[in-house]
Amino acid sequence: MEQTFIMIKPDGVQRGLVGEIIGRFEKKGFTLKGLKLLTVDQAFAEKHYADLSAKPFFNGLVEYIISGPVVAMVWEGKNVVTTGRKIIGATNPAESPPGTIRGDFAIDIGRNVIHGSDAVESAKKEIGLWFPEGVANWSSSLHPWIYE
C-alpha cells in the first residue's frame, strides 16, 4: 500500500487546525501510520527543503518552518500521494478551490498550512528523513469497507 508524508506547518498548528486536517484524511479512508509534534532546527528544515535551496523564497521558507511546532505524519492508502495532494489543494491557496485544506484555511502562499509529498519517490525520502525509526505496522479493521 502506498504511503505519503504530510506536515502541518506552524501556522496550521498555531491556528488549531490539526484535528480538522487529520479528520479529512481519516474520513477519506486513509490510515495514519506515524505522527509527531516537534519543532525542527534550521539544518533539518534545510535538509527537508533541499530541492528548493536555489529558489529566492528558500530562506523565508526555512525560517517559517522553524518558527514553531509542526505535525509530521505518514498516511497510507491506495493512491494516497495523488489523492492527498487533491485534499490539500494547490500550493498557492488562491488557486485552491473551496473544499480543499488550503482553499478553506489559507490565504497566502507563504502561510499555506500544510505540506504533502508530490510523488511516491519524494514521499519515501521524506518519510525516511522524518521517521528514521519507522512507522506503526497496523491495518484498519475498516479496510474491507473502503477497498475492493
From Swiss-Prot:
Keywords: ATP-binding, Kinase, Magnesium, Metal-binding, Nucleotide metabolism, Nucleotide-binding, Phosphoprotein, Transferase
Binding-site list for ATP: 9, 57, 85, 91, 102, 112
GO molecular function terms listed in the Swiss-Prot or TrEMBL record: ATP binding; metal ion binding; nucleoside diphosphate kinase activity
Top-level taxon of origin: Eukaryota
EC numbers: 2.7.4.6
Catalytic activity: a 2'-deoxyribonucleoside 5'-diphosphate + ATP = a 2'-deoxyribonucleoside 5'-triphosphate + ADP; a ribonucleoside 5'-diphosphate + ATP = a ribonucleoside 5'-triphosphate + ADP
Gene3D superfamilies found in the cross-reference section: Nucleoside diphosphate kinase-like domain
GO biological process: CTP biosynthetic process; GTP biosynthetic process; UTP biosynthetic process
Cofactor section: Mg(2+)
PROSITE patterns: NDPK, NDPK_LIKE
Phosphoprotein in keyword set: yes
Active site residues according to the UniProt entry: 115 (pros-phosphohistidine intermediate)
Similarity comment text for this entry: Belongs to the NDK family.
Keyword Membrane: no
Name of the protein described by the UniProt record: Nucleoside diphosphate kinase
Role description: Major role in the synthesis of nucleoside triphosphates other than ATP. The ATP gamma phosphate is transferred to the NDP beta phosphate via a ping-pong mechanism, using a phosphorylated active-site intermediate.
Record-linked InterPro entries: NDK-like_dom (IPR034907), NDK-like_dom_sf (IPR036850), Nucleoside_diP_kinase (IPR001564), Nucleoside_diP_kinase_AS (IPR023005)
Organism: Helianthus annuus (Common sunflower)
